[in-house]
UniProtKB/Swiss-Prot annotation:
<dbReference type="InterPro" id="IPR005707">
    <property type="entry name" value="Ribosomal_uS2_euk/arc"/>
</dbReference>
<keyword id="KW-0689">Ribosomal protein</keyword>
<keyword id="KW-0687">Ribonucleoprotein</keyword>
<dbReference type="Pfam" id="PF00318">
    <property type="entry name" value="Ribosomal_S2"/>
</dbReference>
<feature type="modified residue" description="N-acetylserine">
    <location>
        <position position="2"/>
    </location>
</feature>
<dbReference type="GO" id="GO:0003735">
    <property type="term" value="F:structural constituent of ribosome"/>
</dbReference>
<dbReference type="Pfam" id="PF16122">
    <property type="entry name" value="40S_SA_C"/>
</dbReference>
<keyword id="KW-0007">Acetylation</keyword>
<feature type="compositionally biased region" description="Low complexity">
    <location>
        <begin position="213"/>
        <end position="223"/>
    </location>
</feature>
<feature type="region of interest" description="Disordered">
    <location>
        <begin position="213"/>
        <end position="245"/>
    </location>
</feature>
<feature type="compositionally biased region" description="Acidic residues">
    <location>
        <begin position="224"/>
        <end position="245"/>
    </location>
</feature>
<protein>
    <recommendedName>
        <fullName>Small ribosomal subunit protein uS2</fullName>
    </recommendedName>
</protein>
<dbReference type="InterPro" id="IPR001865">
    <property type="entry name" value="Ribosomal_uS2"/>
</dbReference>
<dbReference type="InterPro" id="IPR027498">
    <property type="entry name" value="Ribosomal_uS2_euk"/>
</dbReference>
<comment type="subunit">
    <text>Component of the small ribosomal subunit. Mature ribosomes consist of a small (40S) and a large (60S) subunit. The 40S subunit contains about 33 different proteins and 1 molecule of RNA (18S). The 60S subunit contains about 49 different proteins and 3 molecules of RNA (25S, 5.8S and 5S). Interacts with RPS21.</text>
</comment>
<comment type="similarity">
    <text>Belongs to the universal ribosomal protein uS2 family.</text>
</comment>
<dbReference type="GO" id="GO:0000028">
    <property type="term" value="P:ribosomal small subunit assembly"/>
</dbReference>
Length: 263
């Protein structure tokens, strides 16, 4: 699929894709994903053609932008690395997120409170989100999936070939997809203009790491406060006092007390 020049992959986006290891696939290849393989490295890792990755991102964005009601798009991620990206994508595009475990019957059992009737489903991994894809096939909902070269392609209508196991790769693909959707909707008016949202916002962050960083910052702040208090105390102790002033003030006070006693 050849894209117009306005939709072509830029050098900056290509650098981002390579930096996030989007092009590094698994060692096994599913037969339907062979056209996306650029070459196989000596260590057995299959390299994905990022030009085809970008073509599928543009195609998926055009499908999403064609749906009038943004909330009719459901984005799913059972994989931990994709849950933050799914929530951010939903907040920027208006889609409906399902982060975490997909409850069976979400698309088929209308009695459940979480029942949904979406017009499009986007999943992070066809393996971990297999339940969502299976239920979508029952009710004829098209599916877009972030697909590695070893991912199953059953009931997947649009597969975006990429590394769907790394946190940076997953976050960047969702970021590029959100940016392209906003461009097609006209929210980002100029394709040359940069989006104010950074890709880092879509990357997974470990809660324990966040707590450790907060604790280290608190310790650093406490250390700085202690050093300031010690420095102030040292300056107070090092200041020289005038003994003559003390003596004069003592004599004056004694004279005033004697005069008051005579009265």
């Amino acid at each position: 699929m050849s894209l117009p020049e306005s939709f072509a992959l830029t050098a900056e986006d290509a650098k981002l894709l390579l930096a996030a290891n989007v092009h590094l696939g698994s060692k096994n290849v599913q037969v339907h994903n062979e056209p996306y393989v650029y070459k196989t490295r000596p260590d057995g890792v299959n390299v994905i053609n990022i030009a085809k990755t970008w073509e599928k991102i543009v195609l998926a964005a055009r499908i999403i932008a064609a749906i009038p009601n943004a909330s009719d798009v459901v984005v799913c991620s059972s994989r931990t690395f994709g849950q933050r990206a799914v929530l951010k994508f939903a907040s920027h595009t208006g889609a409906t997120p399902i982060a975490g475990r997909f409850t069976p019957g979400n698309f088929t059992n209308y009695i459940t409170r979480s029942f949904k009737e979406p017009r499009l489903v986007i999943v992070t991994d066809p393996r971990t989100d297999a339940q969502a894809i299976k239920e979508s096939s029952y009710v004829n909902i098209p599916v877009i999936a972030l697909s590695d070269v070893d991912s199953p392609s059953e009931y997947v209508d649009v597969a975006i070939p990429c590394n769907n196991k790394g946190k940076h790769s997953i976050g960047l693909i969702w970021w590029l997809l959100a940016r392209e959707v906003l461009r097609l909707r006209g929210i980002i008016p100029d394709r040359e203009a940069e989006w104010s949202v950074m890709p880092d916002l879509y990357f997974y962050r470990d809660p324990e790491e966040i707590e450790q960083n907060a604790a280290e910052e608190a310790r650093a702040g406490a250390t700085e406060e202690t050093e300031e208090v010690v420095a102030e105390a040292e300056t107070e102790w090092n200041t020289e006092t005038n003994v003559e002033d003390w003596a004069d003030s003592g004599v004056t006070a004694a004279g005033e007390e004697a005069a008051a006693s005579q009265w």
